[in-house]
Amino acid sequence: MAKKERKFYLVQEDLLPEAILKTVLAKELLLRGDAATVNEAVEKVDLSRSAFYKYKDGVFPFHQWSPGVTVTLAMVLEHRSGILSKVLGILAAARANILTINQNVPVHGLASVTVTFETAGLEGDLDNITKRIRELDGVREVNPVGHSLV
């Protein structure tokens, strides 16, 4: 099955739909601790929970993807020798400073893996790096799921 390539765009704020902007605001409330729960955050910005969950993993303020942040990639890898090593090789070649690697016990031949790394010295952009990882044989999914300012 062919993997669908994800594309990222830099879009001017006033062109974004209100639900996407409110999702960013709700995420910022949670990050700063101004809201303790998703329910509280979405109520404060007048956004439905379903809209929040629809957009939360796909929208980030621009500064959060710039150099000097940590990024967490969640991946599903086939349980075969060398696949994780190849993923780490791509990250090392891009000069990502790896902070943590977590791998769950494989179930039905698939293992969930998260890798968190700093982007300060990153050579290349995150889109190209994740694309190269997705293209590896044995990589089923790659999703940037977390990030924070260093």
Curated annotation (Swiss-Prot):
InterPro entries named in the record: ACT-like_dom_sf, ACT_dom, UPF0735_ACT_dom-cont
Source domain of life: Bacteria
ACT domain boundaries: 72-147
Similarity-based family: Belongs to the UPF0735 family.
Name the UniProt record assigns to this protein: UPF0735 ACT domain-containing protein PTH_1602
Record organism: Pelotomaculum thermopropionicum (strain DSM 13744 / JCM 10971 / SI)
Organism lineage: Bacteria, Bacillati, Bacillota, Clostridia, Eubacteriales
